Amino acid sequence: MANIYLQVDYKTGNIFQFSKTIQEGYESHINTKGTESWRKIYKKGLYAKLEGVSIRDTDFGKEISLYTKMGNGDTAYLNFPLFDQKKNLASYAESLITILPSLKVGESYRFFPYNIKGDNDKYANVGVSVVLADLSNESVIEGAAKPTRLSYSYTKNDIAVKGDIPAIVWEEDFDGSRTMNSKAKNKFLYDTLNAFIAGLSGSAPAQASTPAPTAAPKAPAPKKPAAPVEAENDDLPF
């Protein structure tokens, strides 16, 4: 049985396995520096049993690592950058943390990161869908209850709506401009992640042999902070 190390392409949401050399079933990828590498794309997402979660330090910063077992017996580590370049929680990581308290170790799920932008949308909807799955045929279990997410606090039409997660606070900067203060939100979600990890019966094994990517998998800072959504992110057309 193999150990598989998976990353997420921020721009597409695709889960991929990286290789420096050409491999059967892999696609060519050329980064912004012109360096070619190869990727095996998991277009259906990752179907796997959740075995553990950890925070790992890498040369490029902290990552959330999901330790999972695939239906064929392979161990898959699905890694997400924890912070963006402004030290806010990265989009995929934040989405994943909001659903972690509803997940169970030993349960099988489909993990599907997404980055969706409609023709008339100004900003993309970025996150991670997690639903119960059947590993024997890599399918979503139809009719199964979806894991619930922590809810956001927000203000709409001057009405404050209280949720689980503290609201983003807008403050006036020294030059009169408005700046976003996400510290309370970030701390709450970071504490939620650590509480989930602390509650696990066992820790995920170390990823000593993780292959180094050709470029740092940095999560870009969003051009605009993602507004809390009232609709369930997992009501997706896939």
Enumerate the language-model features and the residues they cover.
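OB-fold ssDNA-binding interfaces and closely related basic DNA-contact patches used
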Residues: 1-82, 87-101, 116-168, 172-190, ...
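Polyanion-binding surfaces on beta-sheet-dominated domains and ring/shell assemblies
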Residues: 129-130, 195-213
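Low-complexity, polybasic segments enriched for Lys interleaved with small residues
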Residues: 212-226
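Short acidic, low-complexity intrinsically disordered linear motifs used
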Residues: 224-238
